[in-house]
Amino acid sequence: MTRLDSVERAVADIAAGKAVVVIDDEDRENEGDLIFAAEKATPELVAFMVRYTSGYLCVPLAGDICDRLGLLPMYAVNQDKHGTAYTVTVDAKKGVGTGISAMDRATTMRLLADPDAVADDFTKPGHVVPLRAKDGGVLRRPGHTEAAVDLARLAGLQPAGAICEIVSQKDEGAMAQTDELRIFADEHDLALISIADLIEWRRKHEKHIARVAEARIPTRHGEFRAVGYTSIYEDVEHVALVKGEISGPHSDGHDVLVRVHSECLTGDVFGSRRCDCGPQLDAALAMVAREGRGVVLYMRGHEGRGIGLMHKLQAYQLQDAGDDTVDANLKLGLPADARDYGTGAQILVDLGVRSMRLLTNNPAKRVGLDGYGLHIIERVPLPVRANAENIRYLMTKRDRMGHDLVGLEDFDEAVPGELGGAV
């Protein structure tokens, strides 16, 4: 596995006017870009970039900068397979020659990052390619465009970067891959980070949820307080069902019974027996109600362990043909578990949870939440509800995904009822 540097080092280097190397997912472009802050552009930096990259130099910009400078899309209907938002090319109107030299392009880059620049300061077309970054950065789109803008912003600079793909020194007709990028970064004393690490860093260090509403929800397990949240950078809504006082005059937020439940339309709503999601949700509500204090956090966007409803149905189709739940996902080119718990962790912190007893049979969920500063003092198992339709699925979760599901070996399809009984 390729050694990566810290996001903190990359941000510090960007602030100091150095370049960094950023790699994306191997299932996406699988390339590394040389990135520096546009306002720090120098002829030397641009010349270095031209020497070791494809030479197609781009300047990612925050959307409001593109609007202020009148940078319209290069083509009305974006057909780029990765959704890169190219705008019309530009040169600085003053202080440049033909616009193509390292000195000229550095001038244009700095001007694009100048907060006082206006549309009339540029000629179009030109030799620098501005790119429009998605609002929300890598949390909305895991691309180099957004990574460059995020790094500049985190460095305290204008949200404008300079990027270009690094070419292979072994095969000049190809782009450099991860191992070669590590060697390149070491040779030139550059930080090497991944977009995945930048996403994780932002999820840990920035608040990206908003509390929207609270209402009383009477259920068959008693009354809960429903607290609604939105993810600021994603079109996803979540709801926490809260029982009792989590933190306040009479509670310190510690030792809270918590269930983080992933949305499952088929199991939670339709009562599908292919999974145990519906019974787990019901059991969690009952256990929190009996406790008199706790949270059941319902995470939207986690359907099918994060792959979405349609992909889940496609995975079911493969399972009907003989694949297990893990292999079905992999055959679709999807991870066995794509869930991220950063949003859930922020919601729990906002509710006042400081330490908790986590209701789950999935040890990975504990790791996913623990990484965000929440102290998990105990993992409380949920009852196992096996039936003839889900027994193979549950055994796969136990044997291949490490879920702690005790008693599955006692399941007997010939015996009526479900293993686990009523809660």
UniProtKB/Swiss-Prot annotation:
GO MF term (any one): magnesium ion binding
GO BP: any one term:
riboflavin biosynthetic process
For this UniProt record, the keywords arranged alphabetically read as follows: GTP-binding, Hydrolase, Lyase, Magnesium, Manganese, Metal-binding, Multifunctional enzyme, Nucleotide-binding, Riboflavin biosynthesis, Zinc
Identify the EC number(s): 4.1.99.12, 3.5.4.25
Give the catalysed reaction(s), semicolon-separated.
D-ribulose 5-phosphate = (2S)-2-hydroxy-3-oxobutyl phosphate + formate + H(+); GTP + 4 H2O = 2,5-diamino-6-hydroxy-4-(5-phosphoribosylamino)-pyrimidine + formate + 2 phosphate + 3 H(+)
Which residues of the sequence carry a binding annotation for Mg(2+) 1? 29
Binding residues for GTP: 259-263, 280, 303-305, 325, 360, 365
Q: Name one GO cellular component term.
A: cytosol
Query: Which pathway features in its UniProt record?
Result: Cofactor biosynthesis; riboflavin biosynthesis; 2-hydroxy-3-oxobutyl phosphate from D-ribulose 5-phosphate: step 1/1; Cofactor biosynthesis; riboflavin biosynthesis; 5-amino-6-(D-ribitylamino)uracil from GTP: step 1/4
Residues annotated for Zn(2+) binding in this entry? 264, 275, 277
Which residues does the annotated region (GTP cyclohydrolase II) include?
205-423
Cofactor(s), by name: Mg(2+); Mn(2+); Zn(2+)
Q: Metal-binding as a keyword?
A: yes
Q: Where is this region: DHBP synthase?
A: 1-204
Identify the Pfam families for this entry: DHBP_synthase (PF00926), GTP_cyclohydro2 (PF00925)
- The residues responsible for catalysis, as annotated, are 337, 339
Of which family is this protein a member?
In the N-terminal section; belongs to the DHBP synthase family.
What's its job? Catalyzes the conversion of D-ribulose 5-phosphate to formate and 3,4-dihydroxy-2-butanone 4-phosphate. Catalyzes the conversion of GTP to 2,5-diamino-6-ribosylamino-4(3H)-pyrimidinone 5'-phosphate (DARP), formate and pyrophosphate.
Q: What is this protein called?
A: Riboflavin biosynthesis protein RibBA
Biological source species: Mycolicibacterium vanbaalenii (strain DSM 7251 / JCM 13017 / BCRC 16820 / KCTC 9966 / NRRL B-24157 / PYR-1) (Mycobacterium vanbaalenii)
